[in-house]
Amino acid sequence: MFRIRYILIFVILLLLGFKIKGELPIESAKYLRAALANADLQPPERKTKYTKYDFAPLWLKTPNFSILGFIGFNYQRIRIKLLSATKDSTHPDTYFIAGKSAVGNNICDFNGTITIRHVRELRNLETRVDETISPARQEGILLAEYYLSENKTQAKAGVFTGIMRTNWYINKKGALCYDDISSASDSFCNNQFIGTWTAYRDNKPLRCNWGDYRVSNSGNLDIGAGEFSPDNKYLAQGWQSYSQAWIYGNENIQQQEEKAWW
């Protein structure tokens, strides 16, 4: 009887989307709750409706020099490149991920998964600057868990875990699109990853967030008004070249920032 009850509880937890092993990082769980509580979203869960779409192209779209990230309490710069994202043909809410990370000159390969947990629709469609009609037929957000494991044979390797958010829209032709409708706004961002990186060697987690154009929960790292701009006190943490390239317009360093480091 006990065994049957245990199995039933296990199945119920799986159906509800709870994790049997491990928990989300605290910051990730808080971000998830806040995102789902946003009054701009319609309450109904729409995951089943949208898993028929392939979200992978939305995660591979942004030029890498516009993907910004930090690791640790001192906001050390980290660069992340997703090389591939492949939808699981059996489980449409799961994607297999391959990519690379770089902190300074230390580069690691990683593989893992992104698993969709929630999809919600916006109550109101956004419009571009100087337009009165939205290009979207529907607009919304995706919230997913990610687990990205770096190659254990490489130096300073570990595991990235957390929650990611992607803003999307369906255009008038029914195609899924990367949501850049509000790209002219000062706070525009997309594909936000909020979580931790945990080293294999000591199992100690460090905050590690990244995303397109801005970084969520970046504290006083980002002091930019119209665009991301690292505070001068963090330039020594890997942000010097970024600042010279994009804040001060050094074209030679811009070319270096745009080079494929992966």
Where are these regions (language model features)?
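Short, solvent-exposed mixed-charge patches
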Residues: 260-262
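Mid-length scaffold segments of soluble, non-membrane domains
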Residues: 94, 101-115, 122-125, 134, ...
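Bacterial Sec-dependent N-terminal signal peptides
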Residues: 1-25
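Tryptophan-anchored aromatic micro-motifs
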Residues: 24-83, 93, 97-102, 130-152, ...
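Long, charge-rich, low-complexity intrinsically disordered regions
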Residues: 200, 213-216
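Extended lipid/amphipathic-ligand handling interfaces
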Residues: 114-118, 163-173, 180-181
